[in-house]
Amino acid sequence: MSRFNIATLFITLLVTLCTFRFVSAESKGPVITDKIYFDIKQGEESLGRIVFGLYGKTVPKTAENFKQLATGQNGYGYKGSTFHRVIDQFMIQGGDFTNHDGTGGKSIYGSRFPDENFKLRHTVPGLLSMANAGPDSNGSQFFITTVVTSWLDGKHVVFGKVLEGMDVVTKIEKTPTNYRSKPNVDVVIADCGLLSDDASEEAVKHAEL
């Protein structure tokens, strides 16, 4: 076999290997870049912890917004805010840390920022997606799906999912609400922040991407 043929064979094998690795990575789902925790209270009762994985490779701007609001590094954010809208067999919504009723909140980029992309779809329960008031009106409000919500595809930006604590999400989903879907007893994000790799290792290990 000539040197030219050997070189050609080597390049072909290398391209095939790289393609296989790319397809394998893609088939596992979007990459989780950061892990965020919410510690939830309702009244004086601790409901537990929710751990989210953020898809910072697919929607970096949206994921960064959520991360910085969770850490409060800019002097404002999710800590102390409530889940103001809860609809059984649909979703739970929070993130309005200014008005606490769905009319407020702001992003780290200003009041609102555009839809980043709609590459990810609402295919399973436990997805983290941006609430909005129409196209390109993302702020700080988000929701967590409790069922498949495919009718939201192309309208709301999915940017993460629940890794641990779906039982806590279910507790919130089932809480009694008034006619405006607001919980009768406030459901509060008592604490939140960024998890280190060591602290979140188990969450990643058990995640279904």
Swiss-Prot record:
Keywords: Endoplasmic reticulum, Glycoprotein, Isomerase, Rotamase, Signal. Its EC number is 5.2.1.8. It comes from the Eukaryota. Residues 37-194 form the PPIase cyclophilin-type domain. It catalyses: [protein]-peptidylproline (omega=180) = [protein]-peptidylproline (omega=0). Glycans are attached at N138. Residues 1-25 form the signal peptide. Its main location: endoplasmic reticulum. It is found in: Endoplasmic reticulum lumen. The keyword Magnesium does not apply. GO terms for cellular component: endoplasmic reticulum lumen; fungal-type vacuole. Pfam families: Pro_isomerase. One of its GO terms (molecular function) is cyclosporin A binding. Belongs to the cyclophilin-type PPIase family. PPIase B subfamily. PPIases accelerate the folding of proteins. It catalyzes the cis-trans isomerization of proline imidic peptide bonds in oligopeptides. This is Peptidyl-prolyl cis-trans isomerase B2. It comes from Rhizopus delemar (strain RA 99-880 / ATCC MYA-4621 / FGSC 9543 / NRRL 43880).
